């Protein structure tokens, strides 16, 4: 599995060229993309500027001497490469297993090209088997939790080291065990209107390409948005 992730990450780095502003994703597959960008800077003299989607990725990039700017210091991002936890046939996805969904979506939005790198196990007919993360402000988080409970969404607060997990933006994450999301667009809109929800892990019709590594090699899926 790790080898598949590495294959996808290295393939994605081929979409990066000199002079670009590059969004560096977060997670186990995006990790290999960041490593490959670091290698190309060191060995090939690749010249780029990068923005990151989490403190974890910032630390990795700094260790590789990748030049960084904050998202507010750039007008746009040429290409962002990130992982995904699930991708359906309509190019909707669930992200945020690593807890960086808000920053990931902020960087994805001004990106001219948005690419996901996944292994083939992440491709699904319908989203929902992977728990859907919802980032909420700390104030009133229990109210939101109970609302989700009443709706039958089987919520749970994400924890780390026995404490509630706190995101880089100092928010909590409530994971929803939905099993199946029949209409990700409609459900995303519902979550958008819940007061106290900062962001959710549904990335609907945002991605341009999905690089999939499988036993038969690497394939690139292109969304209708890109065609």
Swiss-Prot record:
Keyword tags: Isomerase
InterPro entries reported in the protein's UniProt record: NagB/RpiA_transferase-like, Ribose-5P_isomerase, Ribose5P_isomerase_typA_subgr, Ribose5P_isomerase_type_A
GO function term, MF aspect, one: ribose-5-phosphate isomerase activity
Keyword Isomerase found: yes
Coiled coil: none
EC number(s) recorded for this UniProt protein: 5.3.1.6
Xref: SUPFAM superfamilies: D-ribose-5-phosphate isomerase (RpiA), lid domain, NagB/RpiA/CoA transferase-like
GO BP, sorted A to Z: pentose-phosphate shunt, non-oxidative branch
Pathway: Carbohydrate degradation; pentose phosphate pathway; D-ribose 5-phosphate from D-ribulose 5-phosphate (non-oxidative stage): step 1/1
Record: residues binding substrate: 26-29, 82-85, 95-98, 122
Reactions mediated catalytically: aldehydo-D-ribose 5-phosphate = D-ribulose 5-phosphate
Active site: 104
Stated role: Catalyzes the reversible conversion of ribose-5-phosphate to ribulose 5-phosphate.
SUBUNIT field: Homodimer.
Record-stated family: Belongs to the ribose 5-phosphate isomerase family.
Name listed for the protein in its UniProt record: Ribose-5-phosphate isomerase A
Taxonomic lineage from the root: Bacteria, Bacillati, Bacillota, Bacilli, Lactobacillales
């Amino acid at each position: 599995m790790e080898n598949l992730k590495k294959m996808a990450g290295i393939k994605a780095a081929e979409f990066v060229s000199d002079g670009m502003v590059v969004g560096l994703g977060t997670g186990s597959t995006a990790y290999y993309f960041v490593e490959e960008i670091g290698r190309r800077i060191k060995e090939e003299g690749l010249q780029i500027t990068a923005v990151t989607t989490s403190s974890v990725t910032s630390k990795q990039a700094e260790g590789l001497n990748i030049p960084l700017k904050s998202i507010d210091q750039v007008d746009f991002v040429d290409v962002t490469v990130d992982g995904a936890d699930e991708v359906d046939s309509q190019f909707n996805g669930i992200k945020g297993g690593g807890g960086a969904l808000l920053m990931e979506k902020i960087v994805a939005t001004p990106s001219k090209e948005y690419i996901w790198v996944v292994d083939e196990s992440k491709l699904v007919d319908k989203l929902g088997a992977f728990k859907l993360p919802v980032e909420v402000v700390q104030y009133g988080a229990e109210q939101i939790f109970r609302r989700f409970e009443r709706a039958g969404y089987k919520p749970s607060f994400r924890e780390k080291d026995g404490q509630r997990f706190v995101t880089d933006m100092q928010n909590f994450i409530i994971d929803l065990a939905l099993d199946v999301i029949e209409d990700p667009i409609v459900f995303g809109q519902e979550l958008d209107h819940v007061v106290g929800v900062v962001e959710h892990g549904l990335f609907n019709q945002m991605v341009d390409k999905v690089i999939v590594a499988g036993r038969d090699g690497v394939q690139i899926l292109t969304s209708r948005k890109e065609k």
